[in-house]
Amino acid sequence: MVAEDFSQPILDGPGATDYERYLRTDELLALQKSAEEMHHRDELLFTTVHQSSELWLKLACFEVEEAVHAEAGAALRSLGRAVLCLRLVTDALELLERMSPRDFAAVRTQLGHGAGFDSPGFRRLHSLAPGLWERFNAELGGLSLLELYRHEPEPLYALAEALLELDELVTMWRVRHFKTVERTIGAEVIGTQGTPVEVLGRLIHKRWFPELWAVRNELTRAAAT
């Protein structure tokens, strides 16, 4: 019996190893500008943060779509993954804060009219929120949110909290994104698409599932009477 040679790749495609071939690292790592093409050295930092964020958002969208059609247990697992993806996207913004305002200004000249509003990942995720809420309401079967939170029946209560956590993570990203922009270019200027940066600040208060936030007010008021 001939021993298998594990030093040689067995998958098709370019790359010296199966790791490179499966992950298509040649293509992936060619998506960033070379050192010779960069107008400023921090273009690599900026591009890496945003490209990796789009990958995490792609996964988040995949998991949310799964949650819409899954039974409760699987939906909770998928929503938990989506939440972790959003945490990673939010944490990645810290790297942008390591750029000085001067360096960011240099990179900004290369962005054209590109802005965070154009993120296909966030746009897709936003479009999936109504479907999530519709599915959750179907699971409630006429049970009010107030009764749900008074008695905490599982798995409905866990699903409600998972939706709230997803909504909360989107808000946390908006806050961090706004503060990152304010720190790098200021809050009283015009963005790359001609929109005042202060508009980002107003988006902080938007909610995907406002009913889940409002029921907390109802519970608190009811407890005080």
Roles of regions detected by a PLM:
Residues 1-225:
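Surface-exposed peri-terminal alpha-helical interaction modules
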